[in-house]
Amino acid sequence: MIALIQRVKRADVQVGERTTGEIGAGLLALVCAERGDTEAAADKLLAKLLGYRVFSDAAGKMNLPVSNIDGAGRAGGLLLVSQFTLAADTNSGLRPSFTPAAPPEEGKRLFDYFVAAARERHPIVETGEFGADMQVSLVNDGPVTFWLQVRP
């Protein structure tokens, strides 16, 4: 599984005119299931995402996770957006191949599992809508962006 995470001041996702998710300071995570991924991979990626230290401590060092963005225990928001294009194979030609991505039904199942697990472990979780044409807006903080990937 893959997550492209961005530290944000705020972010939201819309489907048409409807806002499906919105957060203040926290992490926007574009999430993709690859062929062969399992719930164990989703759990491993979520643990990495929730524990990844990308927020600054009092000394200005990236040393705090999304569960404690200010060093005083305040949790940041987590906006999870499905994006199968992260699994694209771009090694040949001028058109990406999406064969490495999980099939839509499996991708949705794993994304829904990931979201449910995140909601059990983190107080502020918002989402996009799987398979929808979404408009994602964000104010990137830094910018700070990381590619997280785990194998099943």
Swiss-Prot record:
**EC numbers for this chain:** 3.1.1.96
Question: What reaction is this protein's catalytic activity?
Answer: glycyl-tRNA(Ala) + H2O = tRNA(Ala) + glycine + H(+); a D-aminoacyl-tRNA + H2O = a tRNA + a D-alpha-amino acid + H(+)
Biological processes per GO annotation? D-amino acid catabolic process
Q: Where in the cell is it found?
A: Cytoplasm
Q: What is its main location?
A: cytoplasm
Task: Report if keyword Hydrolase is assigned.
Answer: yes
This protein's UniProt keywords: Cytoplasm, Hydrolase, RNA-binding, tRNA-binding
UniProt GO cellular component terms: cytoplasm
Keyword DNA repair attached: no
Function noted in UniProt: An aminoacyl-tRNA editing enzyme that deacylates mischarged D-aminoacyl-tRNAs. Also deacylates mischarged glycyl-tRNA(Ala), protecting cells against glycine mischarging by AlaRS. Acts via tRNA-based rather than protein-based catalysis; rejects L-amino acids rather than detecting D-amino acids in the active site. By recycling D-aminoacyl-tRNA to D-amino acids and free tRNA molecules, this enzyme counteracts the toxicity associated with the formation of D-aminoacyl-tRNA entities in vivo and helps enforce protein L-homochirality.
Give the domain note: A Gly-cisPro motif from one monomer fits into the active site of the other monomer to allow specific chiral rejection of L-amino acids.
Name of the featured protein = D-aminoacyl-tRNA deacylase
Q: Which lineage?
A: Bacteria, Pseudomonadati, Pseudomonadota, Betaproteobacteria, Burkholderiales
